[in-house]
Amino acid sequence: MAGVNTSVVGLKPAAAVPQSASPAAAKRVQVAPAKDRRSALLGLAAVFAATAASAGSARASVFDEYLEKSKLNKELNDKKRAATSGANFARAYTVQFGSCKFPYNFTGCQDLAKQKKVPFITDDLEIECEGKEKFKCGSNVFWKW
C-alpha cells in the first residue's frame, strides 16, 4: 500500500472501543429546604395573580369597546345581511328571471350590477359599501363607481 499510512488503516471506530470499567463518581444533589420552596412558590403565585388581574381588566376594556362598536353597527349589519340574502337568491336566478341576459352578462352579473340596475344585486353592492371609503369596499377593489 503505497502512500497510505498503515497506522490509520487498522483503527476501530470509537463506538466499538470498550470504555474503562471505572465506577462513576457519585453525584450529590442538594434539595432546598421546604421553607424556601414554599416561599418561592408563594412568590410565584403572587406574580401570576397580579399579572392575571391587570390583564383581565385590560381585556375587559377592549371587550367593552368592541361591544359598544357592535351595538352601533347592528342596524347596518342587519340591513347588509338581508340584502346579501336577497342578492344570493337573485344571483341564482338572474338569467331565468331575465335580469341578467346574455350580451350584457358577458363579464358576469356582478359587473353588470355596477353598470346598471340589477334587482337585489345592485342594492347589495350599495349597502355593502355604505359607510366605507371609496376603494375600501370588498366588491369595489378594481372598480370605480
From Swiss-Prot:
What UniProt keywords are attached to this protein's entry? Answer: Chloroplast, Membrane, Photosynthesis, Photosystem I, Plastid, Thylakoid, Transit peptide
User: Can you cite an annotated GO cellular component?
Assistant: chloroplast photosystem I
Task: Supply the Pfam families for this chain.
Answer: PsaN
Q: Per its UniProt entry, which superkingdom is the organism in?
A: Eukaryota
Main location as per UniProt: plastid
Q: Does the keyword Membrane apply?
A: yes
Residue range of the transit peptide in the UniProt record, numbered on this chain:
1-60
**Membrane association type:** Peripheral membrane protein
Q: Which BP terms does GO give this entry?
A: photosynthesis
Please state where this protein is localized: Plastid, Chloroplast thylakoid membrane
Q: What does this protein do?
A: May function in mediating the binding of the antenna complexes to the PSI reaction center and core antenna.
What protein family does this chain belong to? Belongs to the psaN family.
Protein name, as recorded:
Photosystem I reaction center subunit N, chloroplastic
Encoding gene, per UniProt annotation: PSAN
